[in-house]
Amino acid sequence: MAGTKPSDLGSLKVGQYVVIDGVACRVMDTTHSKPGKHGGAKVRLVAMGIFESVKKEHVGPASSRIDVPLIDKRKGQVLALMGENVQIMDMETYETLELPMPEDVEGIDSGVEVEYFEAMDRYKITRVISK
Protein backbone atom coordinates (compact mmCIF):
# COMPACT_ATOMS: atom_id res chain seq x y z
CA MET A 1 0.00 0.00 0.00
CA ALA A 2 1.51 3.30 -1.00
CA GLY A 3 0.38 6.78 -1.81
CA THR A 4 -1.76 9.43 -0.21
CA LYS A 5 -5.36 10.46 0.24
CA PRO A 6 -6.76 13.98 0.72
CA SER A 7 -8.13 15.11 4.08
CA ASP A 8 -9.49 18.37 5.51
CA LEU A 9 -6.79 20.47 7.16
CA GLY A 10 -9.15 21.45 9.98
CA SER A 11 -9.86 17.83 10.94
CA LEU A 12 -6.24 16.84 11.65
CA LYS A 13 -5.28 16.09 15.25
CA VAL A 14 -1.98 15.67 17.10
CA GLY A 15 -0.49 12.23 16.41
CA GLN A 16 -1.97 11.85 12.93
CA TYR A 17 0.14 11.79 9.78
CA VAL A 18 0.33 14.35 6.97
CA VAL A 19 2.45 15.07 3.87
CA ILE A 20 4.13 18.50 3.88
CA ASP A 21 6.40 19.44 0.95
CA GLY A 22 6.53 15.79 -0.15
CA VAL A 23 7.72 14.59 3.28
CA ALA A 24 5.60 12.21 5.39
CA CYS A 25 5.27 13.78 8.86
CA ARG A 26 3.60 13.17 12.22
CA VAL A 27 1.54 16.11 13.53
CA MET A 28 3.08 17.47 16.76
CA ASP A 29 0.93 20.58 17.28
CA THR A 30 -2.13 22.23 15.72
CA THR A 31 -3.40 25.76 16.25
CA HIS A 32 -6.82 27.01 15.10
CA SER A 33 -7.36 30.74 14.73
CA LYS A 34 -10.30 32.74 13.43
CA PRO A 35 -9.01 36.12 12.20
CA GLY A 36 -12.22 38.04 12.81
CA LYS A 37 -15.71 38.61 11.55
CA HIS A 38 -14.75 38.14 7.91
CA GLY A 39 -12.64 35.32 6.59
CA GLY A 40 -12.36 31.67 7.42
CA ALA A 41 -10.49 29.97 10.21
CA LYS A 42 -6.80 29.23 9.68
CA VAL A 43 -4.95 26.15 10.87
CA ARG A 44 -1.24 26.06 11.67
CA LEU A 45 0.40 22.61 11.77
CA VAL A 46 3.79 21.79 13.24
CA ALA A 47 4.96 18.32 12.21
CA MET A 48 8.09 16.16 12.44
CA GLY A 49 9.29 14.00 9.55
CA ILE A 50 8.82 10.25 9.99
CA PHE A 51 11.85 9.04 8.06
CA GLU A 52 14.17 11.99 8.58
CA SER A 53 14.08 14.27 11.61
CA VAL A 54 12.99 17.49 9.93
CA LYS A 55 10.51 19.94 11.42
CA LYS A 56 7.87 21.14 8.96
CA GLU A 57 5.19 23.81 9.31
CA HIS A 58 2.07 24.41 7.24
CA VAL A 59 -0.51 27.20 7.48
CA GLY A 60 -3.75 27.21 5.52
CA PRO A 61 -7.52 27.64 5.64
CA ALA A 62 -9.29 25.04 7.80
CA SER A 63 -11.50 24.09 4.85
CA SER A 64 -8.56 23.34 2.52
CA ARG A 65 -7.41 19.82 1.69
CA ILE A 66 -4.02 18.31 2.49
CA ASP A 67 -2.54 14.91 1.63
CA VAL A 68 -2.37 12.21 4.30
CA PRO A 69 -0.02 9.25 3.68
CA LEU A 70 -1.48 5.74 3.59
CA ILE A 71 0.48 3.86 6.26
CA ASP A 72 0.64 0.06 6.32
CA LYS A 73 1.79 -1.30 9.71
CA ARG A 74 3.26 -4.80 9.53
CA LYS A 75 5.20 -7.35 11.58
CA GLY A 76 8.50 -8.90 10.58
CA GLN A 77 11.33 -11.03 11.93
CA VAL A 78 14.94 -9.85 11.91
CA LEU A 79 17.03 -12.23 9.82
CA ALA A 80 20.40 -10.49 9.93
CA LEU A 81 22.15 -7.33 11.07
CA MET A 82 24.36 -5.99 8.29
CA GLY A 83 26.21 -2.93 9.56
CA GLU A 84 23.94 0.07 9.00
CA ASN A 85 21.07 -2.11 7.66
CA VAL A 86 18.72 -4.75 9.03
CA GLN A 87 17.33 -7.58 6.92
CA ILE A 88 13.79 -8.55 7.95
CA MET A 89 11.22 -11.05 6.71
CA ASP A 90 7.56 -10.03 6.59
CA MET A 91 5.48 -12.39 8.78
CA GLU A 92 2.52 -12.46 6.36
CA THR A 93 4.04 -12.44 2.87
CA TYR A 94 7.46 -13.94 3.76
CA GLU A 95 9.23 -11.41 1.54
CA THR A 96 12.59 -10.09 2.73
CA LEU A 97 13.37 -6.39 3.05
CA GLU A 98 16.56 -4.52 3.81
CA LEU A 99 15.84 -1.51 6.04
CA PRO A 100 18.13 1.06 7.66
CA MET A 101 18.97 0.43 11.32
CA PRO A 102 16.78 2.77 13.42
CA GLU A 103 18.60 4.97 15.92
CA ASP A 104 15.68 5.24 18.37
CA VAL A 105 14.72 1.53 18.71
CA GLU A 106 16.61 -0.62 21.24
CA GLY A 107 16.97 -4.41 21.31
CA ILE A 108 17.16 -5.24 17.60
CA ASP A 109 18.96 -8.58 17.13
CA SER A 110 18.68 -11.68 14.91
CA GLY A 111 15.45 -13.63 15.50
CA VAL A 112 13.63 -10.71 17.13
CA GLU A 113 10.10 -9.82 15.99
CA VAL A 114 9.66 -6.15 15.05
CA GLU A 115 6.88 -3.84 13.90
CA TYR A 116 7.56 -1.73 10.84
CA PHE A 117 5.52 0.45 8.55
CA GLU A 118 5.46 1.45 4.92
CA ALA A 119 4.51 4.95 3.83
CA MET A 120 5.06 6.51 0.41
CA ASP A 121 7.29 3.60 -0.76
CA ARG A 122 9.61 3.93 2.26
CA TYR A 123 9.98 1.66 5.29
CA LYS A 124 10.85 2.20 8.95
CA ILE A 125 11.18 -0.12 11.95
CA THR A 126 9.11 1.36 14.78
CA ARG A 127 9.51 -1.03 17.73
CA VAL A 128 10.60 -4.46 18.97
CA ILE A 129 7.59 -6.72 19.67
CA SER A 130 9.26 -9.80 21.21
CA LYS A 131 12.80 -10.79 22.05
From Swiss-Prot:
GO terms for biological process: positive regulation of translational elongation; positive regulation of translational termination. It is found in: Cytoplasm. InterPro entries: IF5A-like (IPR001884), IF5A-like_N (IPR048670), NA-bd_OB-fold (IPR012340), Rib_uL2_dom2 (IPR014722), Trans_elong_IF5A_hypusine_site (IPR019769), Transl_elong_IF5A_arc (IPR022847), Transl_elong_IF5A_C (IPR020189), Translation_prot_SH3-like_sf (IPR008991). The modification Hypusine is found at residue 37. Keywords: Cytoplasm, Hypusine, Initiation factor, Protein biosynthesis. SMART domains: eIF-5a. Coiled coil: none annotated. One of its GO terms (molecular function) is translation initiation factor activity. One of its GO terms (cellular component) is cytoplasm. CDD domains: S1_aIF5A. Its main location: cytoplasm. Functions by promoting the formation of the first peptide bond. PANTHER family: TRANSLATION INITIATION FACTOR 5A FAMILY MEMBER (PTHR11673). Belongs to the eIF-5A family. This is Translation initiation factor 5A. The lineage of its organism: Archaea, Methanobacteriati, Methanobacteriota, Methanomada group, Methanococci.
